[in-house]
């Protein structure tokens, strides 16, 4: 017998290192006379798109194509004392540091152009790879070459530290996070009550990333985070032997999600027209870890499907990860409960009534649907 389950779960995720001293980042930026730009920052690119986002920040400041920008891997000989790329803060911290370095050089260029061509600083505008100086138009590299001849420094460091964060653990007071990221996921599952096997049929996700630096990257991060969270709560089970040795040491025994576990119908939308009210890099929000928690929707949907066997009176105690074996035993719990309720239900008691006599764990009250 097949049963469907549906669950809607939200997430509110604080963004910042809780060790406040880690909320800092540096950058080193060089602009060359051919108009190319070389950037070093303290973040580590792991495939999450960090370098692309930080390069976009610099490109936006100078109003040039991102192809001009080359980023070197993190190197403490260039940017020392780097914080970990963690806590979903990579783009926030390093993007801000890179932006400061770029703005420093840009301001030097504006001051030079105003002085050299005898115009006001407000008459110097960077647009679409060109620089307008009142009625004169120069390419970006032409301005750079002129500034070099004019002995203007074309290198700068940038530094950023997250403001407003403080926390007194003894008093349990303060502001541990700079801001929060929000999201919501709705999952629909199909459970085989004979075997405990299940399949995620569809997932709908709405996530808040502020003013997205790169929607394609952010949507990809939401998709990946959700699938990773789904694995955490459904299949990734750690098993130790009697001596405390870990037995699930590889993919043969520790099951991570595969492409076959991703629902054929996976819909991700980013919240539109909602800038981060805090002064983050172009008012964007972090997207690394928050979507991971949205995988909870799958676990709750599985419990909802199993709860239907007892008319949703109670929720089965299916621990995470909800492996097929645990789901099977959850099904057996609900079947037994349903039979017990049928035997003890007084005559005339409505179908919607909830018997409360003699019920003990592994049954839980409540519904996730």
Locations of regions flagged by a protein language model:
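Cofactor-binding beta-sheet edge motifs in enzyme active sites
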Residues: 1-341, 356, 363-369
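Intrinsic, low-complexity polybasic segments
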Residues: 341-345, 349, 357-358
């Amino acid at each position: 017998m097949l049963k469907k389950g549906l669950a809607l779960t939200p997430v509110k995720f604080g963004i910042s290192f809780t060790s406040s001293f880690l909320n800092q980042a540096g950058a080193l930026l060089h602009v060359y006379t051919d108009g190319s730009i070389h950037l070093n920052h303290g973040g580590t690119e792991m495939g999450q798109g960090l370098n692309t986002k930080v390069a976009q920040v610099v490109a936006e400041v100078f109003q040039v194509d991102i192809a001009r920008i080359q980023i070197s891997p993190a190197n403490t000989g260039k940017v020392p004392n780097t914080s970990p790329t963690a806590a979903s803060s990579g783009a926030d911290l390093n993007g801000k540091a890179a932006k400061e370095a770029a703005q420093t050089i840009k301001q030097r260029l504006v001051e030079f152009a105003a002085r050299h061509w005898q115009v006001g600083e407000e008459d110097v505008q960077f647009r679409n790879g060109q620089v307008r100086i009142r009625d004169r138009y120069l390419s970006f590299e032409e301005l750079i070459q002129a500034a070099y001849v004019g002995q203007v420094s074309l290198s700068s460091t940038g530094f950023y530290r997250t403001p407003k964060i403080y926390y007194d653990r003894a008093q349990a007071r303060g502001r541990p996070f700079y801001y929060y990221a929000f999201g919501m996921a709705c999952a629909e599952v199909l459970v085989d009550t004979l075997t405990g096997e299940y399949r995620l049929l569809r997932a709908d996700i709405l996530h808040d990333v502020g003013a997205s630096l790169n929607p394609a990257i952010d949507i990809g991060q939401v998709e990946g985070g959700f699938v990773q969270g789904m694995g955490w709560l459904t299949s990734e089970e750690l098993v130790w032997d009697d001596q405390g040795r870990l037995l699930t040491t590889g993919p043969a025994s520790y099951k991570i999600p595969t492409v076959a576990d991703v629902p054929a119908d996976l819909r991700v939308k980013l919240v539109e027209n909602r800038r981060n009210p805090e002064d983050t890099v172009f008012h964007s929000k972090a997207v690394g870890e928050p979507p991971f928690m949205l995988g909870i929707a799958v676990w709750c949907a599985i419990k909802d499907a199993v709860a239907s066997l007892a008319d949703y009176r109670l929720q089965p105690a299916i621990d995470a990860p909800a492996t097929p074996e645990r789901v099977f035993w959850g099904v057996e719990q609900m079947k037994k409960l349903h039979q017990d309720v049928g035997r003890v239900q007084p005559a005339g008691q409505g179908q919607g009534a909830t018997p409360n006599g003699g019920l003990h764990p592994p049954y839980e009250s409540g519904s996730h649907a």
